[in-house]
Amino acid sequence: MANYFLNKRAVLFVWCAALSVYAYTEIPAAQNAPLPQEQTQTEMTAAVSQAQAPVQGILSITDCKALEEQYYRMQSFDPQLLLDSFDRIREALNTSFEDAGLLDLYFEHAKLISMLYVYEGNRQCGKYDTLIQGEAQDFLRQAEKLTGKRAGFTREQMSALFMRYANYLYTKIGVPKNTFAIASAVPVLYRKALMLNPGNIEAAVKLACWHIFPADVTTGNYNSYIESQEEYIEELSAADRFSAYLLYSIYYMKKYESAKGRAYLQKAVALFPNHVLLLRVYENYRKGIFSL
């Protein structure tokens, strides 16, 4: 367990350093980013998975989110159920690639597999992750070519798939050989998702969170966009809300609005009180450092 915490914190340190370097070099498009329309994550998930027949032995999106929450509570789980489910998804995709629901599940599984490999060094998941890296981007390109075509993918479905892929990549930002390429790709995927579906709340909030890294009291263009997305945080999944709470806490601390900063930190504590990131944020705040 001690090695787990040390390894994870080392990854997080590299991840944060890379983000800081990239964020300060990016020319923001925050002012022109579309604002989300009223559309909940539940509605978007339903749109992506419409007409999908249940496949026996495959974990649903809800099941995957439950495993992710369990992980965020620092409770381990046996990855074999996840890997077996992933095998069945890949088999199903070989016979029915034009099923947006299956691709959605593919990328949701991929994110969890990557988390277990990157953060814990699970070798079995590492073998699967190598497989995913070789085919995931091709899957996304094929789906993009089918977008808007008859019997293809809708814009809303493709928007959701861009976000699934971005979430998968996000788990790898702390890996040194991938850092810059992934840090460059993730915000582009957020914007692509918003272009296809301005109502994609997850994309809007995560793009706002991305802008928090370089934001401070002087960055009015970032700040207006960040604060315009704040009301949508509660629409996210539990794991995504936790990350947003921490980042918005940092944002308000950097703006010297400490009451709001502490309030968001307490929300994060209430959600996942044992998460390792909380220790890092507390330590940084004590030193007057407002970052992860």
At which residue positions do the language-model features occur?
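N-terminal secretory signal peptides that target proteins for export/translocation
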Residues: 1-6
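Bacterial N-terminal signal peptides
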Residues: 13-20
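N-terminal leader/linker segments that initiate helical-solenoid repeat arrays
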Residues: 23-115, 119-123
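Amphipathic alpha-helical repeat scaffolds of TPR domains
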Residues: 56-72, 98-123, 154-174, 199-215, ...
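Helix-turn-helix repeat elements of alpha-solenoid scaffolds
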Residues: 74-90, 125-145, 179-187, 218-228
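Short coil turns that delineate tetratricopeptide repeat
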Residues: 97, 198, 237-239, 273
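Terminal, low-structured helical/coil segments at or just beyond the last alpha-helical repeat
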Residues: 242-250, 254-292
